[in-house]
Amino acid sequence: MRLMKKGTLTLFLLLAISIPLCAQYVVQGVVTDSLTKEPLPYASVRLKDTTEGTTTGSDGRFYFKTHRSEAVLVISVIGYNDYVRTIRPAGNASYKVALAPTEYALGEVVVKPKREHYRKKDNPAVEFVRRMIESRDNYSPYEKDFWQRERYEKTTFALNNFDEEKQKKWLYRKFDFLTEYVDTSAVTGKPILTVSARELLATDYYRKSPRSEKQWVKGRKQAGVDEFLSKQGMQAAINEVFKDVDIYENNISLFTNKFVSPLSRIGTGFYKYYLMDTLQIAGEPCADLAFTPFNSESFGFNGHLYVTLDSTYFVKRAVFNFPKKINLNFVDYMLLEQEFKRAEDGTRLLDHESITVEFKLTEGQDGIFARRVADYSNYTFTPTAEADKAFTKPERIIEETEALSRPETFWAENRPQAAISQQENSVDRLMTQLHSYPVYYWTEKVLSILFTGYIPTSKEAPLFYIGPMNATISGNTLEGPRIRAGGMTTAWLNPHLFGKGYVAYGFKDERVKGLAELEYSFKKKKEYANEFPIHSLKLRYESDVNQYGQNYLYTSKDNVFLALKREKDDRIGYFRQAEMTYTNEFYSGFSFQLTARTRQDESSYLIPFLKKEGDTYTPVKDFSVSAAELKLRYAPNEKFFQTQWNRFPVSLDAPVFTLSHTIAGKGVLGSDYTYNHTEAGIQKRFWFSAFGYTDVILKAGKVWDKVPFPLLIMPNANLSYTIQPESYSLMNAMEFMNDEYFSWDVTYFLNGWLFNRVPLLKKLKWREIVSCRGLYGHLSDKNNPALSDGLFAFPIENTQTMGKTPYVEAGVGIENIFKVLRLDYIWRLTYRDSPGIDRSGLRISLHMTF
């Protein structure tokens, strides 16, 4: 879910694409209801006996191009009479088509424009689909032992509807040259200004046994307003939003969500199907199978499958749209088109794919036009030497060293003819002109700081980043107001050696804190030290405050947005720590980390160390532990979104297994205690097709030795009013002490499954959330200072040990409030009589997702 937010934010920074002008004649117009005069969205518009055509947009308008000087135009939509007329596109006329509502029969199925009585029983369309589903694997390319193909892909983003009126606005008047780069979308017919373009030339390889898929990238080209963002991070976000689509899967992944495929095993319970017409597609007679969800707010599609009228049920062409009322954010219009061809043995081969999207942040805006086009060619089923070489590589995507620096002659020679634009290098020229304007330069700087949190020290290839800026000012009870400044080097300074650090100062305790880190990467990096895969040796020294019982896993403890607390933040001491860490990550998803560490924990007036011997308590200023730690992690098929300071999984579909052990010996390198700590964890996202998904995190751990309380296991308390993963919203810091535990964090996102059925709520497009977090813990007698001498007394009066009852809190929530907010109401279900606790409360977070 964190990555959904990242991917969504960066998507709207990108802005969008133009499609080549390659046809001679334009066919355009609008389709309306003849009675109500309302526009008819998603009507099928095509030229008879051809594959040329489109679907009307949400405003009923259509636009496409053809080289034919004369053709028969056919417009059809469920519940209306078809429109058939001979046209002459050479005249470039605009057609206003009013369709008359009608009743029509499909076998036993009667459809009415106002109130439809749809039945699955004895419906020939449903039976037709069932036979398609039963035979969907018969000619699948994934049943072959091997195949390879050439891929050309172009993804572009553009300012949508960039007409003369918009060009006159004050913002664009400053850049009067923009009119030179305005193009016309061949899909929507709207004027667009392309501001970002990406191209890819690659070879795809597939092997059935052992299962493996590889992509060998020969060329990659990119230019646009998103240049200041991480190239790897942006590519990961775009790949997640515009995933390769397999219509034969049960679920189709798009926009970080999963949508029910019309050929899903549950399709007949999710979709209504109609046999519309018979037409010629590439010389073969095909049935036009239309489909639409029973519930238009659900995560499904409207569309058409053009299926051959033989026993193979071969899909020649697929056209998908989103229902107008779908509970999906920021996507105003989407058109997905796929074309297939047969191999000599009948295997279906994807020949062409395009997805066109109009994004809008709010209603009333023109938003962003985006289009991804992919052409596939040169299929072969005989293994090649190049394929054998690819399968020996550990990474799934193999990128040639010269891929990002290919000359324009390379692209001119390798682009498919249909992909050649009249303004192929327009984005490069546009960016050159924009960068010459100071107002654009400073706007880009501000956006870079807002979206990354860091300030680059130079315009291009910065050697150093200053930040993160959201950690500059914070505060707590021990330090009072706190200021912090820091930064890090990049691969442009040295691709193998990286430095990072910060200096902080508390005005109340008048102490300087800081971090100094030096990392040597055995792999040459492109931008940042933490790029996957990491193979490095790191030296790190840190001196700072220790907020006991608070460990924010996905943000900095100095984040200014965590400053507002529900209780006094006074469980704070000091620590100094020096460590050396060796990290090695593998493309298989396995990684390990070896760390040698020496740490000194220091008491404070808030957290005193009082060593108990009988009835005597002796103050101790500090203690030290020198330890070695081994961490193992396995996350197969994990993909990352890269940022300057961290990286996040693009999705949580991949399971993540972790195992760690820390060992220290008393007297070894100055260690005051023998210490052994083992921890294991697993997390996974489970999709339930149309019913949403569940994120599950399970962890367990144990401290094996007698140690003072700073070395025990303290559950992670969240004292802020924000929603934080893997933390407890109603638990106080240091409320419980354990030396062994088992915890769970389960959140079910229903994606509007219930609200979409409530007339009022479905208009709000809210989505439901149910969560439950809990921890079962135990503190053995040897680590309980009330029962055993030689330990530090618990410094907090209300600290307690757990009985046989686990700590549990549960919540219900609503996300997608104004498209950006999530509100949860949390109840504490156990240990409700403990003093000084909150039994329930409202929590909030920003949550931008599609």
Q: Across the structure, where does each feature detected by a protein language model lie?
A:
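Bacterial Sec-dependent N-terminal signal peptides
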Residues: 1-30, 45, 104-110, 529, ...
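Short, ordered, surface-exposed loop/turn motifs in non-cytosolic proteins
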Residues: 25-27, 34-49, 68
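A short, amphipathic beta-strand motif
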Residues: 27-33, 60, 97
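A short, solvent-exposed loop/turn motif at the edges and junctions
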Residues: 47-49, 74-85
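Short, acidic Ser/Thr/Gly-rich low-complexity loop/linker segments typical of extracellular
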Residues: 51-61
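Extracellular beta-sheet/turn segments enriched in Thr/Pro/Gly and aliphatic residues
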Residues: 88-114
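Structured extracytoplasmic
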Residues: 103-104, 110, 114-286, 292-300, ...
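Exposed, low-structure sequence patches enriched in small/polar residues
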Residues: 257-259, 391-850
